[in-house]
Amino acid sequence: EDVTLMGLSAGGHLALFTGFKNSGDFEFSCKAKIVPKAIINFFGIVDIEDNFNFLKENRPFLNYINIWIPPNKTIQEISQKYSPIEIVHKNVPKVVTVHGTEDRLVPYNHALMLDNVLKNRHLLITVDGGEHWRFSDEEHLAIKKQIDEFMVKEVWTK
């Protein structure tokens, strides 16, 4: 019952997507019986199309999202179906997002999108100048402390 999902980058996207789907009234083939109490998202993709366009413009040689799109689908179809931002609902678990402002693979605005939509169900931990998982030891310690405090106050005592 005390399940927390956590993921980094693509894993963050999957943790958000799975947690949002499993906590809502969605029917899908691999729905779990247990609803997670929280999701810890490290710089995960929130909007697939937005990330695709960001990479297309800024790092086209690293646009890994291209391989996610089957020939018979569009980026819009895939994004609408698999972007966590598209399936936010009132019963989503509490979410912690850790994101660096200088991330060049998943733009920081994805963290801001979640923060704007989830409001009091979300803790945004911003790493000023942080890249995609390029944080110092001191930043890691500060992140861990904030996550621990959030989990104790908002998740484990409820």
Predicted regions and their residues:
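Primarily recognizes the serine-hydrolase "nucleophile elbow" in alpha/beta-hydrolase
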Residues: 1-54
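C-terminal catalytic histidine-bearing segment of alpha/beta-hydrolase fold enzymes
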Residues: 108-158
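Acidic catalytic loop of the alpha/beta-hydrolase fold
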Residues: 47-48, 102-106, 133-134
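Short, conserved active-site loop motifs that form the nucleotide-linked donor/cofactor pocket
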Residues: 3, 95, 122
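Mobile cap/lid helix-loop segments that gate and shape the active-site cleft of serine hydrolases
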Residues: 50-86
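Conserved serine/cysteine hydrolase catalytic core
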Residues: 83-92, 109
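Conserved hydrophobic packing residues within short motifs/helices of P-loop NTPase cores
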Residues: 40, 96-98, 125
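Short beta-strand/loop motif that positions the catalytic acidic residue
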Residues: 91, 96-99, 103
